[in-house]
Amino acid sequence: MRIISGTARGRRLKTLEGMDVRPTTEKVKEAIFSSIQFDLPQATVLDLFAGSGQLGLEALSRGAKRAYLIDYSPKALSVIRENVAAAGFSEQTEVIQTEAAAFLKSSAPTMQWDLVFLDPPYRHDTIQEMLLLLEHHVAPDGKIICEHERELELPEELGVWRKKKTYSYGSIAVTVYIYKEEVTQN
């Protein structure tokens, strides 16, 4: 696993080992970042369920200004910290050990991100729960990028969000959510 493009291009990243680990493939990561390339410069990024931190680090390498990497696993946090240091992004990164829902519930309503990566363990209720919790935490022109199993059909609309597009890559799907128009006009 490596950073694909940007200032840290080619930097190898460590990953977690085990049956429960499912890092984003390079093909899927490249597709995600191709679709958001114009959103990255100076963006503030939230990577929930960060795992190795690769999505947040790829965003920083491509011009994001700050990344918050959230994971509950102590093993994941150790790998994330090593990857952050190896990529040279320690000053631009917050690494936080907590559960994603607890983090969003405790964050001040004024804390907002331009891009949110949501790649939870494949459980059918987690993405929808996180979308609802993210309601006040995404900038008006922000996006939520959800990686999930292809079989999971996410709703066209949920709370303040509407589905912009779903991309499929084999057994994996990526769904992008943005605010409904009436929300950004108020």
Predicted regions and their residues:
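Class I S-adenosyl-L-methionine-dependent methyltransferase catalytic core
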Residues: 1-186
